[in-house]
Curated annotation (Swiss-Prot), chain A:
Protein name per the record: Probable ubiquitin-conjugating enzyme E2 7
Annotated GO MF terms: ATP binding; ubiquitin conjugating enzyme activity
Species lineage: Eukaryota, Metazoa, Ecdysozoa, Nematoda, Chromadorea
Residues at the catalytic site: 88 (glycyl thioester intermediate)
Species of the source: Caenorhabditis elegans
The UBC core domain, residue ranges: 3-163
InterPro entries the UniProt entry points to: Ub_conjugating_enzyme, UBQ-conjugat_E2_core, UBQ-conjugating_AS, UBQ-conjugating_enzyme/RWD
UniProtKB/Swiss-Prot annotation, chain B:
Keywords: DNA damage, DNA repair, Repeat
Matches recorded under CDD domains: UBA_PLICs (cd14399), Ubl_Dsk2p_like (cd16106)
One record GO biological process: negative regulation of double-strand break repair via homologous recombination
Gene that this polypeptide is encoded by: ubql-1
Gene Ontology molecular functions: damaged DNA binding; polyubiquitin modification-dependent protein binding
The protein, known as: Ubiquilin
Basic and acidic residues: compositionally biased ranges: 252-262
Occurrences of domain Ubiquitin-like (ranges): 8-83
Function: May play a role in the ER-associated protein degradation pathway (ERAD) possibly via its interaction with ER-localized proteins ubxn-4 and cdc-48.1 and/or cdc48.2, providing a link between the polyubiquitinated ERAD substrates and the proteasome. Also plays an important role in the regulation of other protein degradation mechanisms and pathways including ubiquitin-proteasome system (UPS) and autophagy.
Length: 164, 502
């Protein structure tokens, strides 16, 4: 069996025993170690507090050389999450140099990252959006220009996530 | 009878706090929420949200279902009460608490304790049992499914039924079956799904037909019949008429009920004694001898051996002095018996030399068997193992080289059935000696490769695997070495092992 699946199995077992604050992770299907189901708990003292946002982590076979893809299934309104739910953070970008020069190589994917470090980054992203490279331009614009509307929109998502 | 299942400790982690909750291992999520509410008095139950492995747990699910075990941590989120809470779902908690509150439903024949009473408007129980459609709809009812999905509860029902209790007391092996949650689940699944039910029945019949076809199948059926079917049917027909829920119903009316499962089974498992007893021409005077007559008549003595090897207690009873003595008496009282045995062996029938050899060796074997030291040897588990290997080798031979088998067949009946005795006493005909050599070489080949394959220095042998384990974050070198040694260097198995051990 490949190293990737062994590594993921270890992470899964660790997480079952000692889960990390702020999210809960498991497999979508017990037979597929490469597809993880994550429930991100809206961080306290943010607009997202009280929400549970479901996401799928899709690991490539050559993990940890390459990063997984993360996609929110629950509707979530955030500058760094595009409208399809794809999460856009630097540590999930393929390793190497950024062709636009925004990100330094050490900010991008590194094989040391685990589900835990990825999710912690995502949670901190929910707390502090990065306006430099918005994936959802409308959300970024709304947050800057019409914060009240932005708040309302996020609250809507939080409410919807609770109903699931 | 364990009505109280073990308590486990579950850590509940909220964004701001951490609580420890003690709860039954098979409790429902709803029960867990009740316990959590003690710590969070401000919240009401609808606001409590338990999350585990990426999923929001639903009230009616159980902890076992999500594999939440002792020491595991679940997340707790209290929803904000911005929106109007929906009307409290009253039905679920009552249903889920039923198993624990009614540990002995049948001891108090009270309609309110009947779990099926919850399903009103279903018609009377007798109607349901007579009508497969109604039965199915009962089985499809979520309340029933929940009840039946709980093996602990099913066990309680069964164990509190006096007929079943008696049955289990007499036949511990049946008790094991009823204690096996998998078997229970399968049975329930089967009842629920008519197609599966029919399929199972068909498979069952087919399997038995196949069994009868292979040499020795009869012997296996006989044992099955004696050990399971007969006591089951006996106890069932006594008063239960095959319906384990009979005593659960408040009314104990004695109207006859149709039980499809019982009847089908009855047909599917033919009573081997019946046919053989008719064939047995003499010695009807003594029950035991009749048994042995038919047993020895069966062409499948070798398969009987197989059965015995896998069942030490049966083996012990087979070789108990009384049994051996009774065989001997039987033999001396009835000289025709050996002839009839020999007549059952095709190659012996055609070859007077072989049949003569068997005839001569039989009394000697029996003498040997009454020797305590031989009996001791027969009970030795390693000897049993050797027997098993012989049997295995033989079946391989049958598969791979049937032409070879014909050569040995006569010896096999004499030597195979009572293998080691034939070898030791050289009582068998000459052909048995060749067979003994063959067995010896087979035993050698199928010996214990594991003992020779043990590496001298595991750290050296598994250096590359050790390195990989290290790189995956398994830092305890001693444990890594132990795991690799135990798995013979299989990295995947070693990781599995390391992860599963705390």
């Amino acid at each position: 069996m490949e190293q990737s699946s062994l590594l993921l199995k270890k992470q899964l077992a660790d997480m079952r025993r000692v889960p990390v604050d702020g999210f809960s992770a498991g497999l979508v299907d017990d037979n597929d170690i490469y597809k993880w189901e994550v429930l991100v708990i809206g961080p306290p003292d943010t607009l997202y507090e009280g929400g549970f946002f479901k996401a799928i982590l899709d690991f490539p076979r050559d993990y940890p050389q390459k990063p997984p893809k993360m996609k929110f299934i629950s509707e979530i309104w955030h500058p760094n999450i595009d409208k399809e739910g794809n999460v856009c953070i630097s540590i999930l970008h393929d390793p190497g140099d950024d062709k636009w020069g925004y990100e330094r190589p050490e900010e991008r994917w590194l094989p040391v990252h685990t589900v835990e470090t990825i999710l912690l980054s995502v949670i901190s992203m929910l707390t502090d959006p990065n306006f430099e490279s918005p994936a959802n331009v409308d959300a970024a614009k709304m947050q800057r220009e019409n914060y009240a509307e932005f708040k309302k929109k996020v609250a809507q998502c939080v409410r919807r996530s609770q109903e699931e | 009878m364990a009505t109280e299942s073990a308590l486990i400790k579950v850590h509940v982690k909220s964004p701001s706090n951490k609580y420890d909750v003690e709860i039954a291992a098979d409790a429902s999520v709803s029960e867990l929420k009740d316990k959590v509410l003690v710590f969070v008095p401000t919240a009401n139950k609808e606001q409590v949200c338990i999350i585990y492995t990426g999923k929001i747990l639903k009230d009616e699910e159980t902890l076992t279902q999500h594999k939440i075990a002792d020491g595991h941590t679940v997340h707790l989120v209290i929803r904000n009460q911005a929106r109007p809470t929906p009307a409290p779902a009253a039905a679920t908690p009552t249903a889920s608490s039923a198993p624990s509150s009614n540990p002995t439903p049948s001891s108090q024949p009270n309609p309110t304790n009947n779990p099926f009473a919850a399903m009103g408007g279903m018609g009377s129980p007798a109607d349901i049992l007579n009508n497969p459609d109604a039965m199915r709809s009962v089985m499809d009812n979520p309340i029933t499914q929940q009840l039946l999905g709980n093996p602990e509860f099913m066990r309680t029902i069964i164990q509190s039924n006096p007929q079943f209790q008696a049955l289990i007391e007499r036949n511990p092996e049946v008790g094991h079956i009823l204690n096996d949650p998998n078997v229970m689940r399968q049975t329930m699944e089967m009842i629920r799904n008519p197609n599966m039910f029919q399929e199972m029945m068909r498979n069952h019949d087919q399997a038995i037909r196949n069994l009868q076809g292979i040499p020795g199948g009869e012997a296996a059926l006989e044992r099955l019949y004696n050990d399971v079917q007969e006591p089951l049917l006996n106890s069932a027909t006594n008063s239960l008429s095959g319906n384990p829920f009979a005593s659960l119903r408040g009314d104990q009316s004695s109207e006859p009920r149709v039980d499809r499962a019982g009847q089908e089974n009855n047909e599917a498992l033919p009573n081997p004694w019946a046919s053989n007893a008719n064939q047995a021409t003499n010695n009807q005077s003594n029950n035991r001898s009749a048994d042995f007559n038919s047993l020895l008549d069966s062409p499948g003595i070798s398969s009987l051996m197989e059965q015995m090897m896998s069942n030490p207690s049966m083996q012990a009873s087979m070789f108990s002095p009384e049994v051996i003595n009774s065989i001997r008496q039987n033999m001396s009282n009835n000289p025709g018996l050996i002839d009839s045995i020999v007549g059952q062996i095709p190659s012996a029938r055609d070859n007077p030399q072989i049949s003569e050899g068997i005839r001569r060796s039989f009394p000697q074997m029996l003498n040997m068997m009454s020797d305590p030291s031989v009996m001791e040897a027969m009970r030795n588990p390693r000897v049993s193992e050797a027997f098993r290997q012989i049997q295995e080798g033989f079946s391989t031979l049958r598969r791979e080289a049937p032409q070879l088998l014909n050569l040995f067949q006569a010896g096999a009946m004499g030597g195979g059935a009572f293998g080691s005795d034939a070898n030791a006493s050289s009582a068998g005909a000459n052909s048995a000696n060749g067979l003994a050599d063959l067995f010896n070489s087979m035993n050698m080949g199928g010996g214990r490769p594991s003992s020779t394959a043990a590496p001298v220095n595991p750290e050296q042998t598994y250096a590359s695997q050790l390195e990989q384990l290290q790189s995956m974050g398994f830092s305890d070198r001693a444990r890594n070495v132990a795991a690799l040694t135990a798995t013979f260097g299989d990295l995947n198995a070693a990781v599995e092992r390391l992860l599963n051990s705390p």
